[in-house]
């Protein structure tokens, strides 16, 4: 069934989903898709294949949404900016042009975890830090089969740090957003990359 839907996606959108995404969906029946919170609400393969750009769409016509944020902004593959056969991932907000988030889908998963660890969403002042540490471990483990070993080592090291309260946002965090930007610029090089695109809804 999953393979049929992936083939339908390729036929409908003239687009072949990245290998990591295909494997993720093939394994999802047993493990479920990676839990990335409100930042990433995964679309079904059927919805991806059926999507058509709205009248006010300002991004490239070959963009392929695969998920959305809690605010309805779309995470899309963007073949127009592809390097070889590798489409980058962009964020498209309503009536806005695309903002590049990661040079590939694997980098998208990696950066999502960095963003999550830099400001745990919904953390009240009296929250249980042990619970948040457990959630961080679960979040990293959910992408473990899909990321390269050096990125996993970095994420594991970050989630082992003590939680700190960000004085400006009030969020608990394992690392500062400024450190995320440095990691993104080092690990996800791409001419159009927007390293300041953090803490999306």
Describe the predicted segments one by one.
Residues 121-135:
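Charged, amphipathic alpha-helical linkers/stalks
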């Amino acid at each position: 069934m999953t393979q049929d839907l992936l083939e339908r996606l390729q036929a409908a959108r003239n687009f072949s989903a990245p290998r990591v995404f295909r494997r993720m969906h093939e394994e999802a029946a047993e493990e479920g898709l990676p839990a990335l919170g409100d930042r990433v609400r995964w679309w079904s393969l059927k919805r991806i294949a059926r999507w058509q750009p709205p009248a006010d769409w300002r991004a490239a016509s070959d963009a392929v949404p695969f998920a959305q944020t809690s605010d309805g902004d779309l995470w899309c593959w963007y073949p127009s900016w592809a390097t070889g056969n590798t489409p980058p991932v962009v964020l498209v907000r309503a009536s806005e042009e695309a903002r590049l988030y990661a040079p590939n889908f694997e980098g998208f998963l990696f950066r999502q975890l960095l963003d999550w660890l830099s400001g745990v969403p919904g953390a009240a002042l009296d929250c249980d830090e042990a619970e948040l540490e457990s959630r961080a471990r679960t979040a990293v483990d959910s992408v473990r089969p899909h990321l390269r070993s050096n990125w996993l080592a970095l994420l594991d090291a970050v989630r082992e740090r003590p939680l700190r309260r960000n004085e400006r946002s009030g969020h608990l965090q394992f690392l500062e957003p400024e450190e995320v930007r440095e990691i993104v610029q080092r690990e996800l090089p791409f001419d159009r990359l927007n390293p300041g695109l953090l803490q999306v809804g």
